[in-house]
Every structure is written in structure tokens, then in C-alpha cells.
Amino acid sequence: MELGMNLITFSLFGDNPLYCQGAVENANLARVIYPEWTARFYVAQDVPEDYIKEIEDYGAEVVRCEKKNSYDGLNWRFRPLSSLKVHYWISRDADSRLSWRERNAVDEWMESDKAAHLLRDCHNHGFTIMAGMFGINNKLFHERYGVLNLDNANANYREADQTLLQDKLWPLIKHDHVCHDHWRNSEIIGQPTYQLGDHVHFNKAYGVGLEYYLKEDVYRQLKEIYPEGQDTRPFPDHLPMDHGIFVGQIIDCLLYTSPSPRD
């Protein structure tokens, strides 16, 4: 491990193909989209070895971890925050896919003087920090705030990782981040993205009053994520996405196949 390394981090536990096959595909995509970065997967003891071998075969790094609770594994991907050997790291979800859309946004953030990077690309991205859509410049973070441990061995519910980020990390980076936010910086054109589980009801998402709902009602509900003076930007231009239509979208591994690396 070299001083100044850059990491893409994932947590992986259980045997659900949504996450396990997604991890394999992200290990492959990382070679193409982030060739100078290291993809690191924090994996639990219950992940099938066949998936782990495929991840390693794509050149990714595997760190084996012991799961203590139902969802403590979600926080493993935050461990580089306390490392003095890592410069930049970005936390991602195994059930979504790396893309050129996010890579160009990451590059833009890296040119800034902000310690953190946030992404919001769908109207249900309403947490202050989306656990699989943020990054940290450790050099700046450590200089300004010191070292922070975000492990949570007691995590026993699905959103525990995002709750902890809101309680411990958000107060520090609330005024020290770049946020690439599609909905904050774009006029609504056509229909918004929608996936099962969105907090925006299907009928509201596609019905009359859509523009008001997204621009006014949702904004009021989520005003905490828009602090005064926030460095918020539209996503920069990018090459086509290989999977999905927005960053952070859940991708069903049975419906998509991994793309071939570009020359």
C-alpha cells in the first residue's frame, strides 16, 4: 500500500446475487472507469468464495471482515477515513454500478478545495449523505477535522450507515463539500426517474403537478441537505453510462451484463 493511494470502497456480506454479482461487475468496471484507483471490497465470512475469486481476478483488493451484527458491514467501506495512507476514497454500493457520469463528477471535485464530495442524481436521494455516493479527501479532512472512526458494531437496521453519517460526518462537512445534484441544478424535462421504493409515490411522480412537487414540496422536505452557500453543481458532460440512467440506481444483475473494457 503506497502513501497517497486512491480507493473505491464497497461492503459485501451475504449471498444475494444483487450485491455479490454486482460487486463482481463493479470490480470489472473499476478497471475501465477508474484505472488508476484501487477497488477495495470489505467482505464478510458469509460471502461465497466463487464471487470473491472473481472480484480478485479483476484485480480488486479484498479485505475479509467479521460481521458482528445485522448491518454493521455497511460501515466497513468507511474505514479508509481513519487511514493516513489514503489520499482520496469514494464509497459506493455494490447493487449500483460505477459510471462515467460519476467519474467526471469525482474529477471535478478533486480539483476543488473541498474535503468531501456528495452525489444526488434521483429524487429519492434525500439523506444528508448518501452512504454509497460520497467521497473524502483524507489529506484535507485530517488537517481540518482530525481522524474519525465510523465503525458501528451495533448497527441492526438497514439505514444505520446513513444515520451515523448524518450524526457524525455531516456536521463536519456540511459547509465543506462539493455536491453534484441533478435535481437542484436542472430544469425538469420529461418524466423523472423512478424505481420501486422511492419516497415519491408513482402517481405523484408522473402525475399533474410534478414540477411543483419536485421543486417546492420535495425541496422543503429536504432543506437540511441544502445548507446556505453550498457548492452545488450540475453533473459534467460524460460518456454514456453502461448501466442504468442515474448514479446510484439499483441494477438487477439478471437484466444486465458487464460491458467490455474500452480501449
Positions of the model-derived regions?
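Conserved small/polar residues in nucleotide/adenosyl-binding loops
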Residues: 256-263
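Short acidic donor-binding/metal-coordinating loop in glycosyltransferase active sites
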Residues: 94-96
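N-terminal anchoring/stem segment of glycosyltransferases
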Residues: 1-67
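Catalytic core and acceptor-binding pocket of nucleotide-sugar-dependent glycosyltransferases
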Residues: 124, 137-252
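A short, glycine-/small-residue-rich helix N-cap motif at loop->alpha-helix starts
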Residues: 69-75
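Short, conserved alpha-helix that lines the donor NDP-sugar binding/gating region
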Residues: 77-82
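Short aromatic/hydrophobic "clamp" motif used to bind/position activated sugar donors
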Residues: 89
